[in-house]
A protein has these predicted regions:
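Short, glycine-/polar-rich solvent-exposed loops and beta-turns at beta-strand/coil boundaries
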Residues: 24-27, 44-49, 125, 162-164, ...
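N-terminal periplasmic accessory domains that precede
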Residues: 1, 14, 48-71, 134
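Outer-membrane beta-barrel transmembrane strands
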Residues: 124-143, 150, 167, 261-287
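Short acidic/polar hinge/loop motifs at secondary-structure boundaries
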Residues: 9, 14-42
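Membrane-embedded beta-strand positions in outer-membrane beta-barrel channels/transporters
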Residues: 14, 52-54, 68, 131-133, ...
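Transmembrane beta-barrel domains of outer membrane proteins
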Residues: 35, 56-58, 135-139, 171-175, ...
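Surface-exposed loop/interface segments of Gram-negative outer-membrane beta-barrel transport/assembly proteins
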Residues: 61-116, 157-163, 171-278
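Short beta-strands and strand-coil junctions in structured, solvent-facing domains, enriched
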Residues: 2-4, 18-20, 38-43, 60-63, ...
Length: 287
């Protein structure tokens, strides 16, 4: 056991110690080197106890100005969904349980319910992933430069309206030979991240747990006037769909399992964002 050190390695990006490299555009990375020997601890201290990873970003080179672009587009989907009961099957099983317990059948006509609500189909969606990177570099025997701009956008496969990640990066690295014995330069990086995630275990559950546990006999939106007048919907703060009808509430499942569509409405606009500037200015003197 070590004190003063975490489980993560120490990241050194262009000579700067950082907690992680989430702010970096992968296209800007020139090389990565892992240091595992004891010498790293003598250089970087106790924070290097778990190892050191040196990251060097791209620099400009002498020659003509070079312009490059790299991009891709892809779509992701859930690899597999659980094979759950439909509404008719669920109703038959619920009736059997009640009858075996000495009660009356809860559903008078299970076959009439059909497939019912597929909660997994409601929350899972195709998720697009887009990346665009453009860079320019060049220089002469006196100065070199490398500049880049990156855009990355990824939707979540679960309710993409409230699960997504967007990152914009900009970088400028340059080096200037002021005198034959003196070179100065800088590495500057700006990153803007805007993201939205889904709580998997909140006070009222989450879309994933609800999609698995909610019964298929409950509709996404309740349209039955008789049920809307019941005590379950007798709440002025209950969430309603754009048409005015309330989102379906299950009378069979623990109420901590919220309607995923109602949950989605409470999370719209709930974003996290950050703006990070990382850089350094250096001078190299040859004696």
């Amino acid at each position: 056991t070590s004190f003063g050190a975490g489980n993560d390695p120490l990241w050194i990006v262009d000579g700067i110690a950082v907690d992680n490299i989430g702010f970096l555009n992968q296209s800007d990375i020139e090389s990565m080197e892992i240091l595992k020997d004891g010498a790293s601890a003598s250089i970087y201290g106790v924070s290097a106890a778990r190892g050191v990873i040196l990251v060097t970003t791209k620099k400009g080179k002498q020659g003509k100005i070079s312009l490059s672009y790299n991009g891709f587009y892809g779509v992701g989907n859930a690899a597999k969904k659980l094979d759950l009961l439909n509404a008719s099957q669920y109703a038959m099983l619920a009736n059997e349980k009640r009858i075996n317990g000495g009660g009356n059948a809860y559903f008078p006509n299970p076959d009439a319910l059909g497939a019912g609500t597929d909660w997994q189909k409601l929350i899972f969606n195709s998720a697009a992933r887009t990346s665009h990177d453009i860079s320019v570099s060049g220089g002469n025997d006196k100065s070199t430069f490398f500049g880049s701009f990156g855009y990355y956008n990824q939707e979540g496969i679960v309710m993409r309206d409230i699960s997504n990640y967007k990152r914009i990066t900009a970088r400028l690295n340059s080096s200037h030979k002021v005198f034959p014995f003196l070179t100065v330069g800088q590495t500057l990086n700006y990153t803007h991240v805007k993201s939205q995630g889904i709580n998997s275990n909140g006070e009222f559950g989450g879309p994933l747990s609800s999609a698995i546990n909610l019964d298929p006999t409950t509709p996404i939106i309740e349209t039955d006037p008789a049920k809307i007048k019941s005590s379950a919907y007798n709440n002025p703060y209950i969430l309603r769909a754009p048409g005015g009808n309330p989102y379906g509430i299950s009378s069979l499942v623990n109420q901590e399992m919220s309607n995923p569509l109602a949950f989605q409405q409470t999370q719209l606009g709930n974003y996290n964002w950050s703006d990070d500037f990382v850089g350094n200015v250096y001078a190299e003197l040859k004696l």
